[in-house]
Amino acid sequence: MKPRDLIARASAWIAELRAQLPLGRRGERAAEKFLRRNAYRIVARNFRAAGAEIDLVAMDGDTLVFVEVKTRRSRDAGAPEEAVDERKQKQIRRAAEIFATRYRADDVTMRFDVIAVDASGERLEIELLRNAF
């Protein structure tokens, strides 16, 4: 492959990622509003540790909830929640352990939820999957 072709491919890939980023942020904002309306208290956003990121950390009563938000424009690539595969779950669990240790929450009940945001229509559709993994 010629360097020029490689640069063109990389540029197209970067442009595609940039186009997706606002959708992801929009989904995270919608998920946060959804959680607040359902009496969750947000304690952290985009927590990064161990090479992973947890989109939202919230309290649901006395339970510390780590929330992964997945947003899709269409289901062509599968349902949003299907993107939270075993590898991603492992990364989130590792980051959650670090969060719990850092903020001395080791003795708190923890849960892992996924929020699937469907952006294929005029309005965002949000589905909460409690205890997703």
Where are these predicted regions, by residue range?
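Short, solvent-exposed loop/turn elements at beta->coil junctions and helix N-caps
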Residues: 45-48, 54, 114-118
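Structural motif
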Residues: 51, 62-66, 109, 126
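Non-DNA-binding regulatory cores of transcription-related proteins
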Residues: 79-82, 94, 98-110
